[in-house]
């Protein structure tokens, strides 16, 4: 990630979305210069880089970097969090340590997003929380997306998707649902 930060700074890209990613191949606790066990580890690397400190702890010759960034949040709880209280605790840490905004994992039920934002505000999280809206465009996403992203699909939406005979029909239903989410 250090080389990516150098390149982004050189290119004038200063606003980042920091995501750990879904790497499942490394053992828990294993850390490399291209992978962090937690997004907060990546956050610390960017914060250090902004102060002119390299990943090995040494100072580097270039000027301090001006990166600002957002981080992920999960209206339906991160799959690795034992409960929502724990998830909110770490979310507060992300904001306390410099996250300028948050972007949610995709969701299909706006009520869950609204409840999540209300909970965040009650816990003192005041940065913008940008909703992650994604249309379903393939029939198989009805079963695949909930398994991969732990996002519930509301029954009225699932019922309409089950009626679809083709991916084109599923896409039309998915895009319409997404439009209605955005309008709401």
Residue ranges, per PLM feature:
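Short, acidic/polar
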Residues: 1-5, 82-93, 174-183
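Catalytic cores of alpha/beta
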Residues: 1-9, 85-90, 115-121, 138-144
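Flexible, glycine-rich active-site loops centered on histidine and acidic residues
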Residues: 2-44
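Conserved, mostly hydrophobic/aromatic
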Residues: 8, 94, 98, 131
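Catalytic beta/alpha-barrel core
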Residues: 17-19, 100-109, 174
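Short, ordered loop/turn segments at secondary-structure junctions
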Residues: 20-23, 74, 107, 134-135
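Active-site pocket-lining/capping segments in soluble small-molecule metabolic enzymes
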Residues: 33-66, 70-80, 87, 122-177
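Short, surface-exposed connector motifs at secondary-structure boundaries
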Residues: 95-102, 124-125, 184
